Amino acid sequence: MFDAIDAALADIKAGKAVVVVDDENRENEGDLICAAQFATPALVNFMAVEARGLICLAMTGDRLDELDLPLMVSKNTDSNQTAFTVSIDAAPHLGVTTGISAEDRARTIQIAINPVTRPEDLSRPGHIFPLRAKTGGVLKRAGHTEAAVDLSRLAGLYPAGVICEIQNADGSMARLPELVEYARKYDLKLISIADLISYRLQHDRFVQRETICEFPSQFGEFKLYAYRNLLDQTEHIAIVKGDPSEFGQQPVMVRMHSECLTGDALGSLRCDCRMQLQAALKMLENHGLGVVVYLRQEGRGIGLVNKLKAYSLQDLGYDTVEANERLGFPADLRDYGMGAQMLNDLGVKQIRLITNNPRKIAGLKGYGLEIVERVPLLIEANDYNSHYLTTKAEKLGHWLVKNYLLAIAIKFTPNVASAQQRYEKLEKIRALLQGTPLMVHEDNRPVAIALFGKNSLIFHVGLDQNLPSGQPWQKHDHSPYPALVKDFLVQLKQWPDLQALAFLIAQGKDPMETLQVSLDRENVSFADLTADALNQWQPQTVYTYSKQGSGEMTNR
């Protein structure tokens, strides 16, 4: 479907435009891009008539500073952080009249990139919209702005590009099927930003490995790889389990973790960052191979002081997203270019990504890494972070259990006592549910242990989507969930070391928060754990199935 980057660079160098597509989970659009030095009146007119979007001039920050072109706004609230400067026309003494004609806009572009042009040679505002590209290009930000500058630079031309969003004739945004046809119709090369990132990853780097050291921890034996970002001199680390020489031969379990001083170091209960970090390290130790990439982007990218200001607003009743927006920031300012280069340095090709955040998947796909599996990371809520976790699920789209189906406790022979043993079992349980919408969430709360017993592996099965309305889910005729749960339980009871299995039906809400003072209990044998039994189960009853039939989950 997509053309090779080398072929696109040849066309850029020859003065032609190319169609550039970003990730479907980002802007999900295609832009027509050409090198700025080849922006003729005819090409500008083609963009205006056949692409129909806003015509912009992507330039380096250094050149925009020379021209004294500040950002259009001091606080950018655009979700993709597109960095518009004030708009411009070439000054009248340079031959521009209204500024809007194709000839005037082409002339303004040529004046802007001319090294002898001074700030007073440009009128403000105008009809060309300069965009400030991030230093580091698409390796720093996977946007069309950076792609335009990178393509021009890689083609050996002046590092500036003209871009225009491609719209359909009816004014709607052209998506990939329309963009494929558009490129075919006008004989244009079609490339993706993901491929451009991969191309640059093969040819240049902005990450430098500084040192490696042993890292014994309470979670296991690891190695720390320290890196420096050569663009901004920030320091980051990779916490590595196993031999990196083996990373290129198999999918590697990876966690991208952004620094959280209050959570990671100070144990804050307002977020789940520390619990996520610790859970990820335990998973790596159990798996024996993997990486936690620890990125220095505090407060989802807004910095420590601004994060604390957001906390102050949360104290007044705002949620985490509203607080960021109140301060003039998007909900999430993080980017994963540095982390992608660190993984590339370690030889990682395929990723089993530990995340609940769809933006991380979109961001890493944009950096040329193949994500073969998403491994959920579900964290226990507390009185302080429960609203925070709910907001992440509802407003940031995180994959967290929103609706609980049942709580399960399993007793094994011998007992599963250590953290490593629990994670081994949970990995096998997650594997049983792979390919289904069902999610697993371990529960270590005292109320769950009191209910099921301290030697039990306790977890919830639930969904990150809404339950069908009407009947209880286990009796719903047109819902897929009863059959999925039946199959899951039947597979569980076949494990040879499983002694007893107990569960409590839920109807969406966390069953540990809706327990009655007195619960019914039914103890039966594994032989009675059939597909038909599900229809008879009731809430507020603990059902225990065992090989012997006594079923009591003892050893409390």
Curated annotation (Swiss-Prot):
Gene that encodes it: ribBA
Gene3D superfamilies attached to this UniProt entry: DHBP synthase (3.90.870.10), GTP cyclohydrolase II (3.40.50.10990)
Binding site for Mg(2+) 2: 27, 144
UniProt: GTP binding residues: 255-259, 276, 298-300, 320, 355, 360
Residue numbers annotated as active site: 332 (proton acceptor), 334 (nucleophile)
Keyword Hydrolase included in the entry's annotation: yes
Residues that hold D-ribulose 5-phosphate according to the record: 26-27, 31, 141-145, 165
EC assignment: 4.1.99.12, 3.5.4.25
GO molecular function: 3,4-dihydroxy-2-butanone-4-phosphate synthase activity; GTP binding; GTP cyclohydrolase II activity; magnesium ion binding; manganese ion binding; zinc ion binding
Name recorded for this polypeptide: Riboflavin biosynthesis protein RibBA
Pathway annotation from the record: Cofactor biosynthesis; riboflavin biosynthesis; 2-hydroxy-3-oxobutyl phosphate from D-ribulose 5-phosphate: step 1/1; Cofactor biosynthesis; riboflavin biosynthesis; 5-amino-6-(D-ribitylamino)uracil from GTP: step 1/4
Region of interest (Unknown), residue spans: 403-556
Any Pfam family: DHBP_synthase
Binding residue positions for Mg(2+) 1: 27
UniProt site positions, description: Essential for DHBP synthase activity: 127, 165
Provenance organism: Synechocystis sp. (strain ATCC 27184 / PCC 6803 / Kazusa)
